[in-house]
Amino acid sequence: MLQKDMYKFAAASENEPIVFGSAQPGYGDEQVNQWIEFMQSQDIKRVCCLLTEFQLIRYSNLLEGYRQGFGIDRVCWAPIQDFNFVKPHVLMHQILPCLAAADQSQEKVVVHCSGGVGRTGHILAAWLVAGRGFSNNAAIAAVKQTGKNPYEAVIAAPFKGRNPWRSAAALNTLLTASKPSLSEAIDHSSF
């Protein structure tokens, strides 16, 4: 299996030059180093990690490994619970500024959760809406074409005791809210 497939590495959309998505590295130090080396071979300069503190426990120190591999000011940690959407304030004040800074610097950034599908997918869709001017539906469709699924939390909603229609509406609201925030995110970016 190619590393690209193993990590589910793909651009946010077919023509996206800066923002990419991926699965997490394996748990051993050697696997983390291989993941970092692979990302660097793809010219990735920044990382946005969506893993929760609980998910980081299995690593010796993943975020520190990223800081050593990419630089202390090139790592964004914005934890999102699995099968959930990002909190709007985290999207607007942490994640979008991270992605906007990468875009301004023309430095490729990879966003990752554990499987590289759901949490990563809806963040990539938010970027396409906020940073590239896509409509919500076009962003979701573009991300789905890359093998990610922004709707994963919607699909999982009944299993989590949530209404899937409300979850779908929440995703739409989140994407819509990300549109005007990008210029503000760029202005306030410290990433």
Locate the predicted segments by residue:
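Cys-dependent protein tyrosine phosphatase-like superfamily
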Residues: M1-V110, G115, H122-F191
